A protein has these predicted regions:
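Multi-pass membrane proteins that catalyze or facilitate reactions on polyprenyl-/lipid-phosphate substrates
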Residues: 1-173
Length: 173
């Protein structure tokens, strides 16, 4: 849905792989990957136990604080996301791999706290998800192939879930 809703930006990235936007996505992706490598054991075990409610609480505090922060701040017009903002948003995305922490919520909050414009930060946040989703899918496929395990999948259910997620995603963005 991100690829469709933000197709103009996606085409810019494809046509100009060394543009500022493309470089900003790389800057955001690197810290996310590094944090995931460090936190991976915690991520895989955190669906159980006390960490989930703590992460929900962190998300709630971030969203409430960002809402207050944005209402009481005037933003300077900027041409786009700075590399510093991309780095900060990438760090937030890395920690958002913990269950209970909203990826888009935390990256948008990080972008706003670092002085970004709400609309630009939101678009960049959604674009940031694309490389991470692709890398995550590649990692999971690699693990399945390496282990030689291919779970049985309800294809019809998967197609329905994909279509619903796609439609809701496009409408939401």
């Amino acid at each position: 849905s991100v690829l469709v809703a933000l197709r103009k930006e996606v085409f810019e990235i494809v046509r100009h792989p060394f543009s500022r936007l493309s470089k900003s996505l790389v800057v955001a992706t690197i810290p996310t990957c590094l944090i995931v490598l460090v936190l991976y054991p915690l991520i895989t075990q955190s669906f159980e136990g006390a960490i989930l409610p703590i992460c929900f609480l962190i998300t709630a505090i971030l969203l409430l604080t960002a809402d207050f922060f944005v209402k009481h701040k005037t933003f300077v017009h900027s041409p786009g996301i700075s590399y510093k903002q991309a780095l900060i948003m990438g760090i937030a995305q890395g920690f958002a791999t913990l269950p209970g922490i909203s990826r888009s919520g935390s990256t948008i909050c990080a972008g706003l706290f670092s002085g970004g414009d709400r609309e630009k930060v939101a678009k960049f946040s959604f674009l940031m998800s694309v490389p991470i989703i692709i890398l995550s899918m590649a990692l999971e496929i690699f693990k399945l192939v390496r282990l030689g395990e291919f779970p049985s999948v309800n294809v019809a259910g998967l197609i329905v879930a994909f279509i619903l997620a796609f439609v809701i995603g496009v409408v939401s963005i």
